Structure formats: C-alpha cells, structure tokens
C-alpha cells in the first residue's frame, strides 16, 4: 500500500517502478554475495599472510571460484596476479601438500625466473642454459624435470623459442608477442614519409626562433625537419643537449600548421615536468591511453587501442628510456595511420622497471630515424652537474673539488654525521649560498627507505627542522586518509 500510494502520488508507471525495484534488489543481492565471497577469500588467504588488498585483487580475477581454483593450483597466483610472488605461491602450495617435483611448480618457477630477470636487466628473453641453471638452483630439483617442463611449456605455447646461433632464446609469449608487434608497427611507420618541402619547414623554424628568441643549432634544426617528414623519429642526447628546446620548437611549429599535438611521459612526475617546461599539457602514458578498471592478458586495459586510436597528428613521448615493452605495445596499438610518433630520451638515463630496454633497442636497431644530440649548450656547460654526467658517461671520473659550482662532494668519516649534515645543507648552507627556499626549492634524493639516511629517517629530521609543529599552525595529526576517487596520481599527494 505504501508503494502504491507513493507511485500514484508521483504519477509514475506502476510496472516500470516495480521493475526498477526488482533491479535494485538484484543489484543489492549481487553486491551482498560478492562481499560474502570477498570475505571468505580474505580469510582464506589470511593464514598465508597474503594482504587483504591482494586477496581482493585475486577475487576480481577469478571470482567466486577462487578458493577451489587456488587449492587445485596455487601457482596461478604467481602466474597471473601482480604482487604475489612465486615464493608466496610456493609457500601456499607446500602447505597444501604439493610435491617439489610437480610440473605446475617447476613450470611456474621457470616463468617467474624469466619475469624477474627481465624486469631486473631489461631483457625480454633468456638463454635456455641460463633458465635451466637458475631453475635447478631456485627450485632445488634436478635438471631433467626442468628440461621436461620447458619442453611442455614450448609445446603449449606459453614459452617461445628462437635460435640465436650459439643458444636458444626463450621468451614468455607475452613478451615475444609484444616485442614483435612493436617492431612491426615501428618498421611500418618508418616507411611512411610526409610530403612537405624543407624550405617550408625552415620557414616555420625561423618563425618559432624569432617568436621564442632562440637560435637552434644545425643538428637541432635537422631534428625538427625530420619530425615533419617521418612518421617515427627518435631524438636522443645527454643532459644539456637541447632536447627540451627541440620539443618546444616542434610543438610551436606544428601548431602553426594546425597539427593536433599530444605530449606524454611514463610517470606523473615526468609528465608534470614536461608540462612546466613546454607550457603545454602533458599526461602520463597510462592516462593518455585512458586506463580502465580490470586487466587483460598484458596486465592493463586501455580505452585507446587500434579500434579507438588517439586523435592526434603528432604524439611526443619524453623520457622514453623508462617505457617498457608492454606499455610500448599498448602505445603503438593506439596510434592511427595519420599520427607521427616522436620519441625523446636519453638511453643512458633511468631504464624501465618492466621488461625490455625499448629506447636503447630502437636506437641500436638502426631501423628507425634517429637524431643524436651531442653538443652541450653554453648554459648547460656552466653546470658541473651536466659536465659530470657526460664525464661519467664517457668513463671519466667526475670533478668533485669545485665548491663554487652546482656540484660538490661532502665527505664524512662517521656515517652518524650524515643526517645532520644533510639537514644543515637544506636548512642553512644551500639557502644562504644560493638564495633557495629549503621547503619548496630543494630536493633530497636517497637510494634507500629505512636506513640512517633513508627516506623515513630523513623526512622526520627535515620536517623537524624545516616545518616544525607550532601552536600558530592550523594543523593536527590524525589518521591517514585514503583517496578512493579523485584525480590524484601517484606521488602527487
């Protein structure tokens, strides 16, 4: 009666409203069942010290049948779930009574070895003898079962073998397919040229030089020319060689010709920096490709792909050295036939954390147009940071004794003095000498997290010096806040 009264009062169609209520009840029921399933899975994994977040990730992949699936083969966790290692899957398997010589264990171990070494060293394959030696050592089994497992994985198509003369190269199918598809796409693009007269390009360069009050070197001008003439281009060079100047010139020249330009970089920080120096919006590659919830066979789903390509005439990717082969596969998938791809980076800088050393391999292949910048410009020559970067690259020792420049070395015999020395540099010496603000204009980089000079300890010390608590400050310490739905990216909080 209550529903009928409400329906008549609101002038709604009765049958339609009942259908809405029915759908709502079904949605509530599905959500309830899902939460029950998640709770059971979290409790199941809790005894193996698997975090709730990882357990939820497992549920999203395998659904309500997760527990029997894992009990039947725990190694699917290492094979298919990012964040769950082979060691953890092996621990679960041993507790469930799996044998050390079982095929599923050895096969999963082999795949994890290829993944791990690929991520560490930038490889996409390993020599067969290397895999066998690593597997025998890690799994503590004899060579015969390992060779049998490799043969079965090759027959099933999970691994791919290519003869390299002295040895067989063994790939995960994922890496093999990605590398092949990227290579084929880039080679096709390298054969595409755009019919535009060099004198027309030079006129555009002259106009940009005049407006921006800059003067390009001949090598830089050639890079801009090739950006107009070819569909795939690499621009590489060390620090201070003018890569950013070229990017800006290409952007402004392309805009004069009414070309739609997009900028992207592998990380949020690199994209932010690119935006700042170019005065033009840059996105992370994941954001550019419109990453969506869920995973596919290569770990992520993107709305932009071969069926829904990026709508641009020119795509410029900075910090290409950090792009791995899987991300590159997604990126090239999303390029339309009209899009020029300009890859900018220094192959001697930070490599990707994933498999593949994409930029270096592209340069070494000599299959893609590549402009190498070697001249260090006047302003960069005055920086000992740039000079020493090139010295190290050339196998020379850095110059450490110029305390009047922007690169100097501070020696301490006692490691316990290091935190206070770093704090003194940030609070007193650098701000006084260079006129910098200790909070907004100085960064401290450290390779560790938990040591004496690690992130956690230094942050505590620097906060107490640079931003100490005060009754005058409108702040209080509370529980951590989790952002679940905001346009906030990693390291921006």
What are the residue ranges of the model-derived segments?
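Positively charged, polyanion-binding regions of nucleic-acid-associated proteins
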Residues: 105-124
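Interdomain "pre-motor" coupling segment immediately N-terminal to P-loop NTPase/helicase cores
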Residues: 141-197
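Short acidic, hydrophobic short linear motifs in intrinsically disordered regions
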Residues: 122-135
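Dynamic helix-loop-helix/coil hinge segments at AAA+ ATPase domain boundaries and subdomain interfaces
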Residues: 207-217
């Amino acid at each position: 009666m209550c529903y009928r009264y409400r329906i008549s009062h609101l002038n709604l169609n009765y049958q339609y409203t009942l259908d809405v209520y029915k759908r709502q009840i079904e949605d509530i029921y599905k959500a309830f069942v899902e939460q029950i399933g998640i709770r059971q899975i979290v409790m199941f994994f809790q005894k193996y010290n698997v975090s709730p977040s990882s357990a939820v990730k497992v549920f999203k992949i395998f659904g309500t049948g997760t527990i029997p699936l894992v009990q039947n083969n725990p190694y699917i966790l290492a094979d298919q779930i990012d964040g769950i290692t082979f060691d953890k899957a092996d621990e679960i398997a041993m507790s469930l009574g799996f044998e050390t010589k079982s095929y599923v264990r050895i096969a999963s171990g082999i795949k994890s070895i290829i993944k791990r070494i690929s991520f560490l060293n930038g490889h996409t394959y390993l020599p067969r003898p290397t895999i066998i030696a690593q597997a025998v050592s890690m799994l503590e089994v004899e060579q015969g079962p390992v060779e049998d497992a490799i043969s079965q994985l090759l027959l099933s198509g999970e691994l791919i073998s290519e003869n390299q003369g002295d040895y067989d190269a063994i790939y995960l199918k994922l890496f093999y397919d990605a590398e092949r598809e990227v290579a084929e796409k880039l080679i096709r693009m390298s054969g595409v040229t755009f019919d535009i007269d060099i004198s027309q390009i030079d006129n555009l360069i002259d106009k940009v030089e005049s407006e921006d009050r800059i003067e390009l070197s001949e090598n830089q001008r050639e890079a801009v020319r090739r950006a107009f003439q070819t569909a795939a281009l690499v621009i590489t060079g060390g620090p201070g060689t003018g890569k950013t100047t070229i990017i800006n010139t290409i952007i402004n020249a392309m805009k004069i010709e009414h070309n739609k330009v997009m900028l992207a970089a592998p990380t949020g920080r690199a994209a932010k920096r690119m935006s700042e120096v170019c005065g033009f919006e840059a996105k992370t590659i994941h954001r550019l490709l419109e990453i969506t919830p869920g995973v596919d066979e290569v770990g992520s789903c993107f709305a932009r792909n071969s069926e829904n390509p990026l709508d641009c005439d020119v795509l410029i990717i900075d910090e290409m050295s950090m792009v791995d082969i899987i991300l590159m596969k997604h990126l090239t998938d999303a390029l339309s036939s009209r899009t020029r791809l300009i890859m900018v980076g220094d192959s001697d800088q930070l490599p990707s954390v994933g498999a593949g050393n994409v930029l270096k391999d592209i340069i070494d292949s000599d299959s893609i147009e590549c402009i190498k910048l070697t001249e260090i410009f006047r302003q960069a020559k005055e920086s000992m940071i740039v000079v020493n970067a090139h010295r190290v690259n050339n196998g020379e020792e850095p110059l450490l004794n110029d305390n009047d420049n922007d690169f100097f070395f501070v020696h301490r015999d006692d490691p316990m003095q290091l935190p206070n020395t770093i704090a003194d540099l940030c609070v007193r010496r650098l701000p006084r000498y260079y006129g910098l603000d200790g909070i907004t204009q100085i960064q401290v980089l450290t390779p560790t997290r938990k040591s004496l000079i690690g992130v956690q300890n230094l942050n505590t010390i620097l906060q107490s010096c640079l931003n100490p608590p005060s009754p005058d400050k409108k702040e209080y310490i509370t529980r951590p806040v989790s952002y679940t739905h905001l346009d906030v990216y990693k390291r921006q909080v």
